[in-house]
Amino acid sequence: MTPDWHSSLILTAYILIFLTGLPANLLALRAFMGRVRQPQPAPVHILLLNLTLADLLLLLLLPFRIVEAASNFRWYLPKIVCALTGFGFYSSIYCSTWLLAGISMERYLGVAFPVQYKLSRRPLYGVIAALVAWIMSFGHCTIVIIVQYLNSTEQVGTENQITCYENFTQEQLDVVLPVRLELCLVLFFVPMAVTIFCYWRFVWIMLTQPHVGAQRRRRAVGLAVVTLLNFLVCFGPYNMSHLVGFYLRQSPSWRVEAVVFSSLNASLDPLLFYFSSSVVRRAFGKGLLLIRNPASSMLGRGAKETVEGTKMDRGGSQAEGVQSSEFVTE
């Protein structure tokens, strides 16, 4: 079936997100894996690694969305595939919101209480925070599977064609709409409020300390702006559809487009990684060099680069003499 213009537009968006997000997140994964393997990694390393994994989960499931869009949003795969891909797709989105909130809290605590934070931070805290984010997202998104067994793939038209998690009966809506509202409140508005407060304080501290370098100030502002864009542009439309749907007692017609914006998160997060970590900045730089010169190879140099990156970050912090500006991943 040839996709119409609407499906073609969404199909193009999904393909672009996949092509830009996958290589960038794979580079970030390689960089963060090197950091986490080091003794006593900071909690933020673990959170950033898990955010990368959440993005990769979404990107690996994106081909199913691409096939769906190419088929004019008719679902020709088995019903269980609809349930499992939807579960993983939406779980990755909502896991990202609390991971972003956790990263913002770590940044704020690092600059507001630098001495206490440095003395008390433990890798275990990052592991616990990441586990909580995954458990909350997986637990809430089981609604996708529950609704599947309420026959969430509904026949449309007269050709025995079905859609995936799109057309609902009244029985399904009675289950879906209240849960979507709770998802919106607990997994979007609460972490967004935490993130806005933490980055507001974080940026204010960074900009008002005279001994913080201009480059670090720019990275602090960039980090806050990218994170805020993530919430407002990527997650905002999709979660607003939950509020509108609950009020109207039916799914709004623009939910499909809102899901596309949520997927854009996987392409926007690498910018956050870039502002967060000097290791990622070097990895992206080496990736560009590799594209320009395919004969060169980065294999086998990860551990050496990670050690060098650690020394460079620490040296830079000492040179600036700013205890409270350790927002750059060490």
Curated annotation (Swiss-Prot):
The keyword RNA-binding does not apply. Highly expressed in hematopoietic tissues, such as spleen and bone marrow, with highest levels in a subset of immune cells, including monocytes or neutrophils. Expressed in adipose tissues with high expression in differentiating adipocytes. Expressed by intestinal endocrine cells. It is found in: Cell membrane. CDD domains: 7tmA_FFAR2_FFAR3. Induction: During differentiation of leukocytes. This induction is STAT3-dependent. Up-regulated in adipose tissues by high-fat diet. The chain crosses the membrane at residues 9-29, 44-64, 80-100, 127-147, 185-205, 220-240, 256-276. Pfam families: 7tm_1. Glycans are attached at N151, N167. Residues 1-8, 65-79, 148-184, 241-255 are extracellular. Keywords: Cell membrane, G-protein coupled receptor, Glycoprotein, Immunity, Inflammatory response, Lipid-binding, Membrane, Receptor, Transducer, Transmembrane, Transmembrane helix. Disruption phenotype: Knockout mice display altered protective intestinal inflammatory and immune responses but no gross developmental defects. GO terms for biological process: cell surface pattern recognition receptor signaling pathway; cellular response to fatty acid; fat cell differentiation; G protein-coupled receptor signaling pathway; glucose homeostasis; leukocyte chemotaxis involved in inflammatory response; ligand-gated ion channel signaling pathway; lipid storage. It is a multi-pass membrane protein. Residues 306-330 are annotated as: Disordered. Residues 320-330 have a biased composition (Polar residues). Residues 30-43, 101-126, 206-219, 277-330 are cytoplasmic. GO terms for cellular component: cell projection; plasma membrane. GO terms for molecular function: G protein-coupled receptor activity; lipid binding. InterPro entries: GPCR_Rhodpsn, GPCR_Rhodpsn_7TM, GPR40-rel_orph. G protein-coupled receptor that is activated by a major product of dietary fiber digestion, the short chain fatty acids (SCFAs), and that plays a role in the regulation of whole-body energy homeostasis and in intestinal immunity. In omnivorous mammals, the short chain fatty acids acetate, propionate and butyrate are produced primarily by the gut microbiome that metabolizes dietary fibers. SCFAs serve as a source of energy but also act as signaling molecules. Belongs to the G-protein coupled receptor 1 family. Interacts with FCN1 (via Fibrinogen C-terminal domain). This is Free fatty acid receptor 2.
